[in-house]
Amino acid sequence: MITQIGSTSSERRCAICSKLGNSYNYGVLSCNACKMFFRRATLGKSEKFCINNDNCDTSNLILTCRQCRYNKCLKMGMRIVTNQYDSLDDIIKVLAKWNLDRSNKLMNFQCFEDPTLDQVIQKHPVFTKKPSNLSFSKSEWGFMEQLTTVEFMSKFEFTRHLFSEDFRIVLKSSCFKIASFIKAVRSYSMKKEDIRYPDGELIVPMELVPFCTSEFLARVQCRLIGRIIELKLKEEEFLLLIAIFVCDPTANNLTARGREILSFHQNVYNDALLQLCLRNEGSCGPARFNDLLSVCHVVNKHVEDIGQLCFMFSFHPPTTKYKRLCAELLGA
């Protein structure tokens, strides 16, 4: 009996600090103090640096470093459960609002500035209402797509806890991919079979068409949207896939802590997408889930093709100037 009592007591210890834990909070057995700490750190603007230059001993029962204590919460499996993440429907609702804001700015606003990526991160550029009779060039559409995608990515929870350089790496690694995916899905919603800008123009500059084979043109303009058409991609699936792409822990040169934070948040959206597939497809849900994740590979191939297209500009310079943000993100 004594052994059983001792065993039960040890099983009711907080996974974070090893004090007595009364219940599961955010998915992990924890004490009230660690529960409240995790909630405050998630909802607030906690420190983004380790006070000991990442030399804290995380095996200590009590961590005075807030950042390392928060990282330990993530490592032990605490899940973010705020008003933003209460349920699958809430997750989708938040993503839909962010995407609607992004789309509204893309379609109805313009930016006269020529910022670098660092300038966009430090201080968001000023948008002004676009006259209804104003037509964008391909380079202007490209700039607005990248700019509004950076702003969209900045709204995600993980940006509060990443080092600034890690966030910059994420933007350089994923922004162009996400903007390309969004453009393909918008073209799909317009009943097109090739990727186009919002005004209906094809994405390949006319001055480069004579130097492209028909096979390459078909690949760069149709492969990604072809996969989307094949899947009959739904709006909710699209939103969750964007979130999964945003939280990419595989980008080169991320810190170990950055990878851990991104992996945690990506798993939240992976779980949400699987839950959606199971709800919509029943026993076929896991197969649908895998099919949707395969889009990531197609997006990567599309971006490689765009890279080849941009390389052609080395020999046939564009007739319009591309802004610095586009040059940085395309060069990533």
From Swiss-Prot:
Keywords of this entry: DNA-binding, Metal-binding, Nucleus, Receptor, Transcription, Transcription regulation, Zinc, Zinc-finger
Listed name of the protein: Nuclear hormone receptor family member nhr-9
Gene Ontology CC annotation, any one: nucleus
Keyword Disulfide bond recorded: no
Positions of the DNA-binding region: 11-85
Compartments where found: Nucleus
Organism taxonomic ancestry: Eukaryota, Metazoa, Ecdysozoa, Nematoda, Chromadorea
Primary location recorded for the protein, binned into one broad class: nucleus
Free-text function comment from the UniProt entry: Orphan nuclear receptor.
PROSITE patterns: NR_LBD (PS51843), NUCLEAR_REC_DBD_1 (PS00031), NUCLEAR_REC_DBD_2 (PS51030)
Gene3D superfamilies tied to this protein: Erythroid Transcription Factor GATA-1, subunit A, Retinoid X Receptor
Domain called NR LBD: residue spans: 101-332
Gene Ontology MF terms: DNA-binding transcription factor activity; sequence-specific DNA binding; zinc ion binding
InterPro entries: NHR-like_dom_sf, Nucl_hrmn_rcpt_lig-bd, Znf_hrmn_rcpt, Znf_NHR/GATA
Family the entry assigns: Belongs to the nuclear hormone receptor family.
Species of provenance: Caenorhabditis elegans
Keyword Zinc-finger: yes
Residues in the signal sequence: none
SUPFAM superfamilies in alphabetical order: Glucocorticoid receptor-like (DNA-binding domain) (SSF57716), Nuclear receptor ligand-binding domain (SSF48508)
Alphabetical list of Pfam families matching this protein: Hormone_recep, zf-C4
Renumbered zinc finger spans (NR C4-type): 14-34, 50-73
Source organism, top-level taxon: Eukaryota
